[in-house]
């Protein structure tokens, strides 16, 4: 990109990148169908082809039946769905989303996060998602980059950042996170014992929140198993209770 000419950058932007912003930036005089098809018209694609692709994107974001509505006739969440459909119409290789849900009320915001997770499970795009909400980042991301003063100070999985913050800033940034929803059984397990094979089993990747009630109720350790079913450790009810109560900020059981 640094070596590309202005013309090359325009072509890359038109054909390889999709973008969604906090403000929907829909053209008010165009219908939903026309808004979604608009970037394809900029590419010079014929009307029949661009409208066919626009219909596909509208169906993908569950706006069937609203093709001929204008933006003013849609709710905020529906308008953002139009923005998402428009950004995907060009079939981008990289999808940039800059605080796309920040302007929505909490209920609609969560609904749109769920919709994004569904779309990604279908599309398998490379997504760069910008947010100031760490809970949102944890829910959506495989990997998170935390920036301060324009500099990336740590990159890792949500679990990495919560369990092993690189700086005091990252530790403060993640301090109020519900750790039980982020940390896995692997993060809290201790070594396996001779009795581990006869214990209730939990997957190493399972989030603590998914089995916390069960292990506390049982008052017995659970065996932690890897992807192939082998026992790789043991997690105690006390370790889970300490996590839930905030007494244990470390990773050991």
Residue ranges and their predicted role:
Residues 8, 70-74, 78-80:
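Conserved ABC ATPase signature
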